[in-house]
């Protein structure tokens, strides 16, 4: 059987690729809403997506300013194993951050009681360190320690991987989070405490034959989505991949030519920057143009603070077109209007960027569901093609 599998892999390609299935679940927002907690949560937390990318305050070297509320709408999750024998965790594969962290048995917070906890004493390969980790959000921080262990990711045994073990997770809202931790896939330059990101460690050990990974997010309610390490599977897209240079090697940041609706520029008229982020669900941009888009599509705020649209209007709404490196990438209303349990909400979100970097957009899952995306570290570029 093993020989048959090996022959099949060789016949398929000279490159062996590893696929991590992603499962689509209810987002933290939906869980809070169903428990009657969303309105109170939104009232207490002034959500600003920009804080994930541009912390407002400088922090010590060991502090990772990564607000956890930014994962409020994420719906795609995968399973990894840490330790020997492996202890399983549900994580967000996040191209908008670079650290790996999971809850640990040292955590006494309410949020940890509803999640899988890593126990170093149950792993024969765990190595402790004196390093610490603190991820800030809202009114508190997730604090923890750093350690090394073997991480199992889609059939890859990533040995000697540094990761964070949470000790406190303030904020009872995390109790309802459908994920245990975060696996960051951005560049090492934004990694907290100089920790080597998972994909960098995998590549450095020669565990994949190509220095890239790719993502397919299915619109299906549950299955089909995947992260592919070390290769590209053309069955997930149509046509050819179009390549876009990374403009800043930190996040997966690219240049956008324009953003139009009905042939008219609605934002980014003179070009702008965008971050391709699997850890953000929505299409996020500056407050002013987003407010105009919300008005144009007839979105209004409901009692929970969500921007809702009449479901019957979807068929009459226009595409939003992102022109990137000379190629047009339309996002249809069926993609940017999110339908759930008979209600329709806008897939756009405003943010205030406290930097001098100009107009910045976040191309989250609303965009990635439309376009198979390759994150090419070898050539510092992003590949995009319409999903099959």
From Swiss-Prot:
Major location category of this protein: secreted
Proregion span(s): 16-40, 41-62
GO molecular function, one term: aspartic-type endopeptidase activity
Signal peptide: 1-15
Keyword terms, alphabetized: Aspartyl protease, Digestion, Disulfide bond, Hydrolase, Phosphoprotein, Protease, Secreted, Signal, Zymogen
Documented EC number(s): 3.4.23.1
Further comment found in the protein's record: The expression of pepsinogen genes is regulated by hormones and related substances.
Stated name of the protein: Pepsin A-1
Taxonomic source organism: Macaca fuscata fuscata
């Amino acid at each position: 059987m093993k020989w048959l599998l090996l022959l099949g892999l060789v016949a398929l390609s000279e490159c062996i690729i590893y696929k991590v299935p992603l499962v689509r679940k209810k987002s933290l927002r939906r869980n809070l809403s169903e428990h009657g907690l969303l309105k109170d949560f939104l009232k207490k937390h002034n959500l600003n997506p920009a804080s994930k990318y541009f912390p407002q305050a400088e922090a010590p070297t060991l502090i990772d300013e990564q607000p956890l509320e930014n994962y409020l709408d994420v719906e795609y999750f995968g399973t990894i194993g840490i330790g020997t024998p492996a202890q399983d965790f549900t994580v967000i594969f996040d191209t908008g951050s670079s650290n790996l962290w999971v809850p640990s048995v040292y955590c006494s917070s309410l949020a940890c009681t509803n999640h899988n906890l890593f126990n170093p004493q149950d792993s024969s390969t765990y190595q402790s360190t004196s390093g610490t980790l603190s991820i800030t959000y809202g009114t508190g921080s997730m604090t923890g320690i750093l350690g090394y262990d073997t991480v199992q990711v889609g059939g890859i045994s990533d040995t000697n991987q540094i990761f964070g073990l949470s000790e406190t997770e303030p904020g009872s809202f995390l109790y309802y989070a459908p994920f245990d931790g975060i696996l960051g896939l951005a560049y090492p330059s934004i990694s907290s405490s100089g920790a080597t990101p998972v994909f960098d460690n995998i590549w450095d050990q020669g565990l994949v034959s190509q220095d890239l990974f790719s993502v397919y997010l299915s619109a299906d309610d549950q299955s089909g989505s995947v992260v592919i390490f070390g290769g590209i599977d053309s069955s997930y897209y149509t046509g050819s991949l179009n390549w876009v240079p990374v403009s800043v090697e930190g996040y997966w940041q690219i240049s956008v030519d324009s953003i139009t609706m009905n042939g008219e520029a609605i934002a980014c008229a003179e070009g702008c920057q965008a971050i391709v982020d699997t850890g953000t669900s929505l299409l996020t941009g500056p407050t002013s143009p987003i407010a105009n888009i919300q008005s144009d599509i007839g979105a209004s705020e409901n009692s929970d603070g969500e921007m809702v649209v009449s479901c019957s209007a979807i068929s009459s709404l226009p595409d939003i077109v992102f022109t990137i490196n000379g190629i047009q990438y339309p996002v249809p209303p069926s993609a940017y209007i999110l339908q759930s349990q008979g209600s329709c909400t806008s897939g756009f979100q405003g943010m205030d960027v406290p930097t001098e970097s100009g107009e910045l957009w976040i191309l989250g899952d609303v965009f990635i569901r439309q376009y198979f995306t390759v994150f090419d570290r070898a050539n510092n570029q992003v590949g995009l093609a319409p999903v099959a």
